[in-house]
């Protein structure tokens, strides 16, 4: 009841939940995410919480640690030398940024009607959000302007960014699989290689390390991998020098 009252006052769900529960830990975005992970855990799994050391979420470097947000900001600003102490190896590449696809994303948003917005994951149809998003997209002259026009206490910046990106990538709630049809390995350490060998024998799902291994997938798994590959090609446009597909 207190949660519903907070939402009725225009608070975002995390803020309304914190006010209803009176829990200081729910003031942190990462702690809110942790609560959702705990809710999703199947019976029999036990969670282990580990205190965060050093930099806070989106905060400056502290205690020998830097947040991912801080590191991305340094790299995008061309200040790689300041980021290097917090990285496993010196940075020598380009940093991706949605600023490079601002017009492309906005072009997609301007073509969308309320039904298109409602079809997105977390599109907020029950809250009346699609009408606000469609109206904001038609009048905004940049992505930041779109976020500023659409933002309210209930619809925070982070949610709007996710919706804009989902729209650009063509994601739809109805097409989201209920469970992951395969495991995609993006990187691993020496210990990870040992675990990978064991996974190939014990994992209930196909394990994909190299794109060529996706040829063995079929049905929904193959369709999802192909969709993932197409969206990765779009990510290549986020670099200062656009990268080719593949």
Predicted features, each with a name:
Residues 1-246:
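Active-site cores that bind ATP or allylic diphosphates and position pyrophosphate for catalysis
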């Amino acid at each position: 009841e207190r949660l519903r009252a907070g939402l009725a006052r225009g608070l975002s769900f995390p803020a309304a939940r914190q006010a209803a529960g009176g829990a200081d830990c729910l003031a942190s975005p990462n702690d809110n995410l942790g609560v959702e992970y705990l809710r999703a855990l199947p019976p029999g799994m036990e969670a282990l919480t580990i205190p965060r050391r050093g930099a806070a979420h989106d905060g400056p470097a502290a205690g020998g640690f830097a947040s991912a947000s801080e590191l991305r900001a340094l790299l995008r600003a061309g200040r790689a030398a300041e980021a290097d102490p917090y990285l496993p190896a010196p940075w020598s590449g380009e940093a991706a940024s949605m600023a490079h696809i601002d017009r492309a994303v906005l072009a997609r948003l301007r073509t969308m009607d309320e039904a298109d917005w409602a079809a997105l994951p977390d599109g907020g149809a029950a809250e009346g959000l699609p009408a606000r998003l469609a109206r904001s997209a038609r009048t905004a002259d940049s992505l930041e302007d779109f976020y500023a026009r659409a933002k309210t206490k209930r619809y925070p910046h982070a949610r709007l960014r996710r919706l804009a990106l989902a729209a650009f990538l063509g994601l739809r709630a109805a097409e989201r699989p209920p469970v992951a049809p395969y495991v995609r390995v993006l990187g691993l350490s020496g210990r990870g290689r040992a675990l990978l060998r064991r996974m190939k024998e014990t994992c209930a799902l196909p394990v994909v390390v190299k794109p060529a291994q996706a040829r063995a997938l079929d049905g929904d798994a193959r369709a999802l991998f192909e969709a993932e590959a197409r969206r990765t090609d779009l990510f290549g446009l986020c670099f200062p020098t656009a990268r080719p597909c593949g």
